[in-house]
Amino acid sequence: MNDCANYMDYILNKLDERTLLEQLAEEASELSQAALKLIRAKGLSENVTPKTEDGVMQNLAEEMMDCSIVMALLSLKDKKIRTAVHHSEGVSENLKWKRWAERLGYEEKK
């Protein structure tokens, strides 16, 4: 087993599902803050920030990775979550894309 797999196993054995869900909520909140900060850093808002766009982009990428890691751990920890995630891939994913596009005014060409 490589180091990463050892770390994952250790974390999965150490933390229960509730703790992982709490961690996901925290990381998702930090991701939200990073996305809002990037809006400001790019000058897309009147409320500018002194932080650089590159620095804020790096923070956003880190928060995205943090969320991905916790989501992966949750899918390994809980069979129901894993099943729901794998079941929703593909068919549901297309429906989500379609709904989003339609909300934005997309019309299928006939």
Q: Can you describe what each PLM-predicted range is?
A:
Residues M1-K110:
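Flexible "arm" and connector segments at domain edges
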